[in-house]
Amino acid sequence: MSHKVKIYDTCIGCTQCVRACPLDVLEMVPWDGCKAAQIASSPRTEDCVGCKRCETACPTDFLSIRVYLGAETTRSMGLAY
C-alpha cells in the first residue's frame, strides 16, 4: 500500500506512536529539537497498513504524526471524491 507517514516537529519524543504501531513502521532517532532528544521516524512506510494507531496514541494537541492514506485505500473505503 502507498500510505505516507509524516512526522511533524511538534513531536515531543514520547515513543507512544512507536509502541502503538503493530507493524514496526516507526522508530525513534536522535533529534535536538525537544527535551527527549529524539523524534519519531518512519523508515518502513511500505509496511504501513493505514490503521492510524500512531495518530491515536499521540498525546500532543498538534497530532505530531499523521498517516495519509493512499488512493487505493480511500477508494475501497468509499472516501474518495
UniProtKB/Swiss-Prot annotation:
Ligand binding ([4Fe-4S] cluster 1): 11, 14, 17, 58
GO MF annotations, alphabetized: 4 iron, 4 sulfur cluster binding; electron transfer activity; metal ion binding; oxidoreductase activity
Catalytic activity annotation: reduced [plastocyanin] + hnu + oxidized [2Fe-2S]-[ferredoxin] = oxidized [plastocyanin] + reduced [2Fe-2S]-[ferredoxin]
Residue sites binding [4Fe-4S] cluster 2 per the record: 21, 48, 51, 54
Location of the protein in the cell: Cellular thylakoid membrane
Cofactor(s) it depends on: [4Fe-4S] cluster
Keyword Iron-sulfur on entry: yes
Domain 4Fe-4S ferredoxin-type intervals: 1-31, 39-68
GO biological process: photosynthetic electron transport in photosystem I
Cofactor remark from the record: Binds 2 [4Fe-4S] clusters. Cluster 2 is most probably the spectroscopically characterized electron acceptor FA and cluster 1 is most probably FB.
Subunit note: The cyanobacterial PSI reaction center is composed of one copy each of PsaA,B,C,D,E,F,I,J,K,L,M and X, and forms trimeric complexes.
Function as written in the Swiss-Prot or TrEMBL entry: Apoprotein for the two 4Fe-4S centers FA and FB of photosystem I (PSI); essential for photochemical activity. FB is the terminal electron acceptor of PSI, donating electrons to ferredoxin. The C-terminus interacts with PsaA/B/D and helps assemble the protein into the PSI complex. Required for binding of PsaD and PsaE to PSI. PSI is a plastocyanin/cytochrome c6-ferredoxin oxidoreductase, converting photonic excitation into a charge separation, which transfers an electron from the donor P700 chlorophyll pair to the spectroscopically characterized acceptors A0, A1, FX, FA and FB in turn.
UniProt-recorded name of the protein: Photosystem I iron-sulfur center
Native source species: Rippkaea orientalis (strain PCC 8801 / RF-1) (Cyanothece sp. (strain PCC 8801))
